[in-house]
Amino acid sequence: MVVLGQKFPEVEVQTTHGRMRLPDHYRGKWFVLFSHPADFTPVCTTEFVEFARNYDKFKAMNTELIGLSIDQVFSHIKWIEWIKEKFNVEIPFPVIADDQGELARMLGMISPYKGTNTVRAVFIVDPEGYIRAMLYYPQETGRNIPEILRLVEALQTADKYGVATPANWHVDRYEFKPSSIVGNDVIIPPASSLEEKKDREERAKKGEIECFDWWFCHKKLE
């Protein structure tokens, strides 16, 4: 498992934008590599939408985005199409299909206590290929994208001026807003049986919950 300050491991990966070699593909740029537990899951979908809607802000800081899960590339492509169809949001960044989990294990993205899916990890890598920040979130908690933007800016500022940034530095500069697709609703875990799927669909018809699909339902807290 890698540690903070270490060089990002050299690896060739299959992505939705074709094969690429990391970290060389992004040499001269910063990049944010983030893993998600699985395609066609609700929390991950909200994250991808928010990463996409903030993509230009990352680009303005000479920073690229790249996603990862242990799904196959065909699943990634279909999920990206679903997101475009449902929310009219293009996913402009590549997504790694680490279907054997090799890179995920190198980066400590798979917890032996949390199943075989990747956790919600974030790695910020500088233009020389060094890992500058590592964040891990549990599967049930979505990430705050403005905080990741703030962290990138803080690291770049530290490098440029030889300074350090204090707690809550520039939180006022970034708009901490609810999810653009579910607001402050909470997400109901995806159905794990046909009976549960049918129940969700019935509850949605009654207006008890809202669903974009049978696996993506949300509601207000009572």
Curated annotation (Swiss-Prot):
Gene3D superfamilies: Antioxidant, Horf6, Chain A, domain2 (3.30.1020.10), Glutaredoxin (3.40.30.10). It is found in: Cytoplasm. The active site is at C44. Keywords: Antioxidant, Cytoplasm, Disulfide bond, Oxidoreductase, Peroxidase, Redox-active center. Residues 2-157 form the Thioredoxin domain. SUPFAM superfamilies: Thioredoxin-like (SSF52833). It comes from the Archaea. It catalyses: a hydroperoxide + [thioredoxin]-dithiol = an alcohol + [thioredoxin]-disulfide + H2O. One of its GO terms (molecular function) is thioredoxin peroxidase activity. Substrate binds at R120. One of its GO terms (cellular component) is cytosol. InterPro entries: AhpC/TSA, Peroxiredoxin, Peroxiredoxin_AhpC-typ, Peroxiredoxin_C, Peroxiredoxin_TDXH, PRX_1cys, Thioredoxin-like_sf, Thioredoxin_domain. Pfam families: 1-cysPrx_C, AhpC-TSA. Disulfide bonds join C211-C217. GO terms for biological process: cell redox homeostasis; cellular response to stress; hydrogen peroxide catabolic process; response to oxidative stress. NCBIfam families: PRK13189.1 (NF009668). Thiol-specific peroxidase that catalyzes the reduction of hydrogen peroxide and organic hydroperoxides to water and alcohols, respectively. Plays a role in cell protection against oxidative stress by detoxifying peroxides. The active site is a conserved redox-active cysteine residue, the peroxidatic cysteine (C(P)), which makes the nucleophilic attack on the peroxide substrate. The peroxide oxidizes the C(P)-SH to cysteine sulfenic acid (C(P)-SOH), which then reacts with another cysteine residue, the resolving cysteine (C(R)), to form a disulfide bridge. The disulfide is subsequently reduced by an appropriate electron donor to complete the catalytic cycle. Belongs to the peroxiredoxin family. Prx6 subfamily. PANTHER family: THIOREDOXIN PEROXIDASE (PTHR10681), THIOREDOXIN-DEPENDENT PEROXIDE REDUCTASE, MITOCHONDRIAL (PTHR10681:SF128). Homodecamer. Pentamer of dimers that assemble into a ring structure. This is Peroxiredoxin.
